[in-house]
């Protein structure tokens, strides 16, 4: 089976910078406490006009431009995120629309938290090998600032927002191996909001019927 090699990357950060000093004014912490335990001095938060999808689009656009490829050459788009602005449409579909990627190619999200980008790479590798195509767009994007309790110093000091994107090329004689796993028994130790409870589903049924 062919392997993947990195052709180009892109990145995007939102507009609001939050320093350790900023956090020390809202929770019992300090720059020294955070830096010595995490190495983090500042993180970036989305402004009102930004979210995981807008960051993903910016990062993907930069990666595509750096690759020198045309949008039509991208065979699949996989985005890893647990903080998409909507359950549907996916971030990957928003990227597909914004960049003009072909509509007859797969585009979808995966949610595997911190390991999500690795899962997305593995998914892209499988798609290229089974469906054909040479290039994949893989994205990792989060807007965790909107999910974190700003009064909980065990989480608010760690998480921020941003996106990274990679154009990967399927190639002969390229070493490639991924080991994936999960420990669902520890799920009680990490939790997030019930996104499906926040808003009802909306759909223009007639319009969907016409293009489906």
Regions found by a protein language model. Give the residues of each.
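Acidic, glycine-rich active-site loops and adjacent beta-strand->loop/helix elements
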Residues: 12, 80-85, 112-117, 140-145, ...
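Condensing-enzyme catalytic core mediating Claisen C-C bond formation in acyl metabolism
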Residues: 1-48, 152-212
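Conserved catalytic cysteine-centered active-site region
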Residues: 35-54, 81-135
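Buried hydrophobic positions in well-ordered alpha/beta secondary-structure cores of metabolic enzymes
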Residues: 6-8, 34, 63, 77, ...
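Conserved beta-strand elements of the Class I
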Residues: 5, 75-78, 137, 176
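Phosphate/pyrophosphate-binding loops at sites that engage ATP/ADP/AMP, CoA/4′-phosphopantetheine
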Residues: 59-75
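Flexible, glycine-rich active-site loops centered on histidine and acidic residues
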Residues: 129-163
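Acidic-glycine-rich active-site phosphate/pyrophosphate-binding loop
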Residues: 27-36, 86-101, 138-144, 193-200
